[in-house]
Amino acid sequence: MKLLLLSVTMALAGCVSLSVPSFWDDNQSAAIVSVRQSIENINCAEPHAPQAADVQQRLRWFELYSESKGYAQQDVIRLVQPLKETVDDFARRSNEKQGSKTYCELKKSTLVDQASTAARAVLGRF
């Protein structure tokens, strides 16, 4: 009996560490596609700062909306964290000084990959 009780306790304790993914949300889906589109539209021949600011603002809307929905959205917020860090770095450096076209293209490539991954995850929820 003690062994059964111990086994049940251990099984339930293991379930506590599992997180339940958040569910589909139309607004989040539209917002992450908007972020992705603004990244795809970056033109490295043009000034980088305003383009980076646009991506930053769209991503911030996504974050604020997700935070406003509550704790259940923590998975989505963690999901876009790497993208946010890359966007913030691009915006900061672009505000300090216009980077080279090569720098922009490399940063854009990274952002495209990160945004694509985030969009697939957000749109793939049920």
Where are these regions (language model features)?
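Post-signal-peptide N-terminal segment of Sec-exported extracytoplasmic proteins
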Residues: S34-Y65
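Bacterial signal peptide processing site
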Residues: V16-S19
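Short, low-complexity, Pro/Ser/Thr/Gly-rich segments in the mature regions of secreted, periplasmic
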Residues: K107-F126
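Alpha-helical transmembrane signal-anchor/signal-peptide segments
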Residues: P21-S34
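Sec-dependent signal peptide recognition
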Residues: M1-T9
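Long, amphipathic, charge-rich alpha-helical segments that form helical bundles/coiled-coils
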Residues: R58-E105
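C-terminal motif of bacterial Sec signal peptides marking the signal peptidase cleavage site
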Residues: A11-G14
